[in-house]
Amino acid sequence: PYWLKNQATSGRFEVSNRALIGAALGPESVSVNLDFSLEGHEFTVKTPLRYKYRDRVQGEVFDPFVVLPALTLSSSEAVMVFNDQKPKSLNITLTAHRDAQKGSLSLQHPENWRVKPKYIDFDMPKAGSQANLSFTIYPPKEMQSGQLIPLAQIGDQFYTKSLLEIQYPHIPKITVLEQAQTQ
């Protein structure tokens, strides 16, 4: 949805295209123009791309067509609190959305924090496969807040997005890609 494209600040959603405000979901993310010619008259119909499948209970189901990155990441913790100097583990789950995803995962962190290991190699041969990787986080001596951002590199491409799917029977499926991070 258009209101989730930008990071929310101060309890408000930031919307770059103000003309969309008030719309339920906003325009379809992927649509095509179909050109027809009938008895010498030409016309064009714009239609959204949809993924159609059959469910034994619901019958025909139409989901919005979504283009996903090759890899998405999710963190086991949205927020980590360090009451002392003891290190904590942070687990990152990688999900491959294409075959043959091989690369390395690192964790961006504030300057005076330490993370071990510096990076972890991964190899995910099939789309849909997942890898659970773990980092140990060492906080600084002085209390400080910061962000831990997982960063997967495959060749010269970098991936930092987390996938959230919202699916209920009474609304269309909503797919949200947001920055993967731990506070």
Enumerate the language-model features and the residues they cover.
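Long, contiguous interaction/targeting segments characteristic
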Residues: 16-56
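Beta-strand elements of well-folded, non-transmembrane domains
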Residues: 36-40, 51, 94-98, 109-111, ...
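Short beta-strand elements
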Residues: 41-74, 157-182
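Short beta-strand segments of immunoglobulin-like
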Residues: 76-83, 122
